[in-house]
Amino acid sequence: MKKLISTTLASLFCVACLNAQTFDMKVAQPCYNDSIGYGWDVTNVPTAKELKKGLKRPVYFSVKVPDGNYKVTVTIGSKKYAANTTVRAENRRLFIEPLSTKKGELKTFSFVVNKRTPYINNKMSVRIKEREKDYLTWDNRLTLEFNGTAPAVASINIEKADVPTVFLCGNSTVVDQSREPWASWGQMFTRWFDDGIAISNHAESGLTAGSFLASNRLEKILTMMKPGDYVLCEFGHNDQKEKMAGSGAWYNFSYNLKKFIDQVRKNKGNIIFVTPTQRRNFKDGKIQETHGDYPDAMRAVAKREHVPVIELHDMTRTFFETLGEENSKRALVHYAAGTFPGQDKALADNTHFNTWGAYEVSKMIVMGMKQLGLPIVSHLRPDWKDYSPAQPDDFNKWNWPLSPIFESQKPDGN
């Protein structure tokens, strides 16, 4: 696994790292190390035979770069063989869905990847959790994952990108989940935007609005933010479990939401609230409310402070009720024992989404942005199609080649 960059190394990146870097993936490339600054990572280096006849497994390629937004241009396919490739970045952020190419067929795509470390300044860093130290999102490199039944990448170009950024704040329903079969809408959200927008997901499992602030995550965002950037905040799941003095929807939670508003606006950013996703809790075919006053408290703060709201709470209720009590399990981490390597017990989680569920929820977020008339929806990809949670996509057509890292333990939060 990749090591976190130390604060002392943060200032030592060479100027060359800021320029465009192009890699010919048809020839042998080294195994990544910090002194070289690029190479195959995470899994075994492709063999000469694999490069000649084609891969049948996922591979990762990393490039050492400073914090920031990077336009990544990949040419996928091969002149030697037919291929099937999906492209993700960092912690399984989806950019290109599985795409088949014929022998000799090459296709080029561009997208923007946000890369960061915990470093803020010489006196402050993000206080990440122990589990985050193995994440591909907090280290000193930008990592691309090439997956699929026969992944093929011909070339990679990486260059700095000066584009608007959408920052995501939240908990386990938003975070870039690092391991199968867990997923959240934040890591699917990247799929829908062209190379004129960056998505920077700072959410983490188990966080409340208060612990997000206390761990310096908003401070990190503010150091990266430019005037006109966006900040989306989804909280409420874990906040309702706080028991300290002053906790509750109408005091501590509301007060912390106001802190987000004030700090983002002070830095000339645009803040948007997202009401929490529903839990799968049915009675007589209807979803039962489990979040208490927290969604209403968020709405009240938003109304008072003139903050736009994406009603994910309502959309996910419609989504679950449309699927029904049994079929709604398909959107969440419900799997029989033995479904995944090393999984000796059944998984039954009514809060956390699997990849299909997260993909569907990401579409709800985009629809919420469209309904609010946000200018950044002009950067939606040409293949975007409007979505309704009352008409979900066909689960049986979902295709997600598994990343090679699995975990049976639930993410923090419930």
Annotate each language-model stretch with its function.
Residues 1-21:
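Bacterial Sec-dependent N-terminal signal peptides
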Residues 14-17, 196, 268, 306:
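A generic structural signal for alpha->beta connector loops
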Residues 19-180:
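Compositionally biased, intrinsically disordered or flexible polar/acidic segments
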Residues 22, 199-201, 306-309:
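Conserved beta-strand scaffold positions in the cores of enzyme catalytic domains, especially
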Residues 35-51, 176-181, 201-216, 239-248:
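Acidic/histidine-rich helix-loop elements
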Residues 90, 216-382, 386, 390, ...:
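Alpha-helical cap/lid subdomain in secreted, periplasmic
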Residues 139, 161, 194-196, 266, ...:
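Short, well-ordered coil/turn elements that cap or connect secondary structure elements
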Residues 144, 148-204, 217-231:
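Serine-esterase "nucleophile elbow" of acetyl-processing enzymes
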